[in-house]
């Protein structure tokens, strides 16, 4: 963001940046200057031209300090919340961090012996406490995920060109050094052009293959490897040679170019050498991503459960390890004591649930104590649960089903307090919104995920209004705390079975074979459903209704719902 402001101040042409994105960045700058947290989920409703949630998330990734291609080590922005949080964590006695930061800390300690939670030379904290621990394996898995996109290469290419140009600036005034610098620039641009063309060819091939399969997400399996991968990897290896040449040039110019150096502003050959070294690491990481994502070198069907599920969504390839239990065991071993807490740590509070937990979380060695703490809530007095069995609510009924869900929302209006409706897909949610929007009473407001603001902003408005209607998908099934009458009716549109074509679900199911239903689908569904229903009762004084508009809950899955809910399930048409 600071670079864009700098370019604008210089009068540079920014026509390659979409006007809506510039408006978005301007709003971000105003938000942060006014005390904004810098966290994506806390984004307020943006003024100006609107963009859908996917486009806005892509804009955000270009300025996020958490992006894989961002290097914060030499950042001179003293007010950066990302850097400030890391500095505070390194000197604190108690560190409160999110799951991703705990996972990142472990990876850094394992790779380069560097901890985010301790100053150099000191041991990391002795005790690790993870709340909402049911979610931790996914966050941990993400630390070992890699991706391949045109944007990743474009960003790396620009950084390499900028760094080589800066090295050339130091060479001005010396004929020999300048000749070497110009030769280096020309050589790099040639390799970069080859990589650019071949990456475009890779993505054209992938999109063509995806269209053949008539799918919006291509799950890749052995045999789907890109046949011309070496045409990208070979010039990429030559780029490493260019970077080493640039480092040697920096070393040779040190005594001659010292007059141009300014350490405080980071304008020095020493700084450029460090920068070139880190860029070389990014080139190696891109090469590894090419192998895993397009070459399928670590696919789970080739090397087993620790291998990758790989997929292409039209914009990028992703490779993600399927099972990380062995790596989790290494994390637990790095702390003297580990405490995990969650209302849904075990899919079921019995032996099957405990066994699943041990296997999934990597507790295969050492002493472990597991238990279920009694709830402080009187669920039989505080919650009443219904399942709606009207024939129109069958999953195959499409728009008719959406109309019937809208009718249940309309009936809930006569009860005081807020209404939350949890969906398993954006499509069904948006169809129901079309039916419900014209009928919202004057004393209520309709808040829809992806249309009326970020998660934090929607929840704040929902709580403060006290009589609102909130429609949410995925992230609203958990991590939502709305005590009191602000939430008195919770409608669950459908039992949240994971989609079988989700990459990790497909991989886990394939590895589990005939036991997939019992060991994969049921535990994951149970935890999601229990999390969703848990949004209703947050204090000992809360009361309300749960309505599940999925007739399967009273049919073949009745036993399953009985295990998930803390109260009996009543039938209603």
Each predicted region: which residue ranges?
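A substrate-engagement module of RecA-like helicase motors
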Residues: 1-93, 100-103, 158, 165, ...
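Conserved interdomain hinge at the start of the Helicase C-terminal
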Residues: 388-424
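N-terminal targeting/trafficking signals and adjacent low-complexity tails
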Residues: 547-573
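Conserved helicase motor "Helicase C" RecA-like lobe of SF1/SF2 P-loop NTPases
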Residues: 424-450
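Conserved RecA-like ASCE P-loop NTPase motor core of nucleic-acid helicases/translocases
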Residues: 340-343, 417-429, 547-549
């Amino acid at each position: 963001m600071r670079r864009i402001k700098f370019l604008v101040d210089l009068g540079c042409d920014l026509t390659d940046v979409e006007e809506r994105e510039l408006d978005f960045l301007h709003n971000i700058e105003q938000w942060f200057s006014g005390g904004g947290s810098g966290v994506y989920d806390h984004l307020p409703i943006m003024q100006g031209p609107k963009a859908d949630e996917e486009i806005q998330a892509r804009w955000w990734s270009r300025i996020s300090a958490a992006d894989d291609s961002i290097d914060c080590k030499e950042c001179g922005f003293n007010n950066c919340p990302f850097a400030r949080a890391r500095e505070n964590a390194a000197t604190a006695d108690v560190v409160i961090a999110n799951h991703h930061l705990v996972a990142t800390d472990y990876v850094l300690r394992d790779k380069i012996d560097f901890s985010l939670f301790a100053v150099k030379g000191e041991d990391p904290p002795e005790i690790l406490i993870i709340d909402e621990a049911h979610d931790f394996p996914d966050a941990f898995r993400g630390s070992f995920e890699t991706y391949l996109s045109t944007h990743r290469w474009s960003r790396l290419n620009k950084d390499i060109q900028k760094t080589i140009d800066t090295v050339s600036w130091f060479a001005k005034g010396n004929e020999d050094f300048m000749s070497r610098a110009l030769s280096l620039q020309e050589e790099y641009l040639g390799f970069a052009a080859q990589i650019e063309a071949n990456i475009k060819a890779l993505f054209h091939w992938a999109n063509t293959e995806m269209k053949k399969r008539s799918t919006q997400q291509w799950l890749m399996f052995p045999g789907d490897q890109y046949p011309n991968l070496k045409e990208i990897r070979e010039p990429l290896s030559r780029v490493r040679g260019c970077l080493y040449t640039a480092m040697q040039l920096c070393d040779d110019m040190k005594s001659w170019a010292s007059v141009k150096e300014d350490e405080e502003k980071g304008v020095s050959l020493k700084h450029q050498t460090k920068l070139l070294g880190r860029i070389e690491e990014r080139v190696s990481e891109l090469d590894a991503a090419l192998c895993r994502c397009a070459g399928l070198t670590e696919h789970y069907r080739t090397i087993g459960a620790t291998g990758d599920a790989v997929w292409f969504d039209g914009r990028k390839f992703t490779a993600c390890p399927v099972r990380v239990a062995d790596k989790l065991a290494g994390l637990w071993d790095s702390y003297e004591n580990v405490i995990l807490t969650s209302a849904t740590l075990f899919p079921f509070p019995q032996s099957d649930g405990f066994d699943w937990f041990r296997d999934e979380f990597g507790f295969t060695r050492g002493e472990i104590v597991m238990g279920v703490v009694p709830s402080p809530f009187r669920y039989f007095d505080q919650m009443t649960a219904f399942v709606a069995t009207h024939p129109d609510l069958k999953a195959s009924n499409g728009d008719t089903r959406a109309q019937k869900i809208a009718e249940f929302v309309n009936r809930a209006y006569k009860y005081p307090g807020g209404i939350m409706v949890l969906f398993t897909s954006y499509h069904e949610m948006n169809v129901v919104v079309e039916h419900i929007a014209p009928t919202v009473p004057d004393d209520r407001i309709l808040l829809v995920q992806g249309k009326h603001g970020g998660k934090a902003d929607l929840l704040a408005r929902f709580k403060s209004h006290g009589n609102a209607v909130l429609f949410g998908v995925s992230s609203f099934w958990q991590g939502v705390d709305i005590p009191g009458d602000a939430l008195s009716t919770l409608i669950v549109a459908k039992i949240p079975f994971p989609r079988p074509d989700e990459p990790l679900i497909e991989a886990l199911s394939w590895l589990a074979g005939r036991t997939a239903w019992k060991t994969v689908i049921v535990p994951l569904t149970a935890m999601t459903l229990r999390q969703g229903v848990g949004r209703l009762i947050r204090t000992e004084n809360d009361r309300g209704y749960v309505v599940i508009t999925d007739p399967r809950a009273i049919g073949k899955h009745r036993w399953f719902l009985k295990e998930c809910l803390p109260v009996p399930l009543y039938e209603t048409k």
